[in-house]
């Protein structure tokens, strides 16, 4: 009985320690007022002139031509992205091309960098009879027919979402989005912005809606992407439980994160699938390091 009690106590202490480390990670993200910045990520579909999706191999060749091998990043010889001084390029599950512009002081700076990226890509795309399209969902292909790029993490995500709900394939293979990152001053500022973002989310989704078809079928309802996300994984999508209450904090958010299924985790540098286990349940793999 003492051994079991001691073991349970050790697990409880370790869980508390890990939650505090996640809390410390959030706190380490606080920025001084003079140093606050904004970042943006924009995902694109790479489409050929016959309106078919460019293949992973074609997009990899395109990026190597544009950025050169020295700026490209690989996983087991497969190109996964590129990095410059101003932004990073990555490939999403079905080869959607994402630019992540490093945080800047103003929206105008982000706009200038993005326009520079488009101009840099323009001639290379033209030579290959390709173009970039920015819309919320794959405009021509069916998601289930699009293969995953050779990235281990996406294999684990794909397998996991097949067992949660019905829209994981559409989310991973068929969708694209624009994401914005905004700095916060302190915990109070974080909570205010987090809650406001969740309240504005459906409004912004409606205002920026640009999805005309889903898997070849014309869309008849508004915000179809939201409908997709509503049926991906209820444990990790939607409004964070308790986040709109007055008690919401770094710590309560850390508790939520700690108990959401991981899907995968790193073990000595190797990405391992964890299925539906959360960090709290997978203590053999998860010992969170200091931020």
Please name every model-derived segment:
Residues 1, 107, 111, 190:
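Flexible, glycine- and charge-enriched loops at secondary-structure boundaries
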Residues 4, 10, 50, 185-187, ...:
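A very general structural signal that marks isolated residues within well-ordered alpha-helical segments
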């Amino acid at each position: 009985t003492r051994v079991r009690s001691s073991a349970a106590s050790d697990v409880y202490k370790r869980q508390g320690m890990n939650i505090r480390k996640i809390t410390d990670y959030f706190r380490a993200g606080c920025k001084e007022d003079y140093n606050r910045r904004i970042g943006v990520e924009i995902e694109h579909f790479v489409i050929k002139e016959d309106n078919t999706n460019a293949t992973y191999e074609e997009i990899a060749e395109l990026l190597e031509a544009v950025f050169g091998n020295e700026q490209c990043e690989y996983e087991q010889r497969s190109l996964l992205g590129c990095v410059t001084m101003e932004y990073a390029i990555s490939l999403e599950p079905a080869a959607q091309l994402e630019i992540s512009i490093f945080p800047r002081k103003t929206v105008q700076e982000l706009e200038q960098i993005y326009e520079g990226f488009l101009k840099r890509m323009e001639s290379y795309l033209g030579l290959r009879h390709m173009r970039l399209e920015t819309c919320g969902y794959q405009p021509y292909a069916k998601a289930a027919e699009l293969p995953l790029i050779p990235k281990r993490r996406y294999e684990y995500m794909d397998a996991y979402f097949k067992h949660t709900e019905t829209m994981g394939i559409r989310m991973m293979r068929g969708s694209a989005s624009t994401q914005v990152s905004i700095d916060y001053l302190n915990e109070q500022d974080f909570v205010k912005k987090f809650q406001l973002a969740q309240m504005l989310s459906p409004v912004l989704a409606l205002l920026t809606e640009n999805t005309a078809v889903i898997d070849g079928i014309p869309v008849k309802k508004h915000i179809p992407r939201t409908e997709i996300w509503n049926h991906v994984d209820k444990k990790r999508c939607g409004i964070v439980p308790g986040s709109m209450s007055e008690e919401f904090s770094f710590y309560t958010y850390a508790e939520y994160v700690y108990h959401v299924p991981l899907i995968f985790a790193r073990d000595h540098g190797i990405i391992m699938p964890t299925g539906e286990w959360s960090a709290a349940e997978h203590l053999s793999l998860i010992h969170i390091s200091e931020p």
